[in-house]
């Protein structure tokens, strides 16, 4: 076979809410794991990992979530695919992203597998600057994740072109201890 094959991974974004009022107001937390291996060792990241050869993507998302956080049995929905060839220093990686939402008191989180820790973080993303350049609408966002033990900040650039076909890209300008 003459084509090199990329690696496939899944990541799962799990949001939690304290009660119905918090859900209505959009006060959510996100479940993150502290990476125990390279790349980005010691940084906080979404739970995820590599797809086994004979494994469906959704099964990978569920397996990695359970292995890294102890959380299982959640409904998951695929919402995006990321494939920038330079996004991972290890190899050419294509990631299918999944989403779930749960009442925080319904799950117990415990780090496992290659995760050094797992925890809920409050999230806040505020637009800092917005401008147009070369036909793109660009907005820089200040992303903050925090819990009772720590706080991390990142700067994300969103590039968007609207029309019949919308193009949207995200660029991490400053990671700040968040593996992205």
Protein language model features and the residues they cover:
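N-terminal strand-loop-strand
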Residues: 1-45, 58, 73
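Unchanged
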Residues: 51-180
């Amino acid at each position: 076979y003459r084509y090199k094959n990329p690696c496939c991974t899944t990541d799962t974004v799990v949001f939690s809410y304290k009660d119905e009022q918090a859900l209505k107001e959009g006060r959510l937390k996100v479940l993150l794991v502290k990476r125990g291996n390279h790349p980005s060792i010691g940084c906080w990241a979404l739970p995820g990992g590599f797809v086994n050869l004979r494994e469906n993507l959704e099964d990978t998302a569920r397996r990695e979530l359970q292995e890294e956080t102890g959380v299982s049995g959640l409904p998951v929905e695929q919402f995006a695919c990321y494939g920038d060839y330079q996004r991972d220093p290890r190899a050419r990686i294509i990631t299918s992203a999944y989403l779930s939402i749960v009442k925080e008191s319904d799950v117990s989180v415990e780090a496992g597998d290659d995760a050094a820790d797992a925890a809920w973080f409050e999230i806040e993303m505020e637009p800092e600057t917005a401008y147009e350049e070369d036909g793109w609408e660009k907005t820089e966002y200040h992303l903050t994740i925090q819990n009772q033990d720590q706080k991390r900040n990142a700067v994300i650039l969103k590039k968007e072109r609207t029309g019949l076909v919308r193009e949207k890209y995200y660029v991490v300008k400053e990671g700040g201890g968040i593996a992205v």
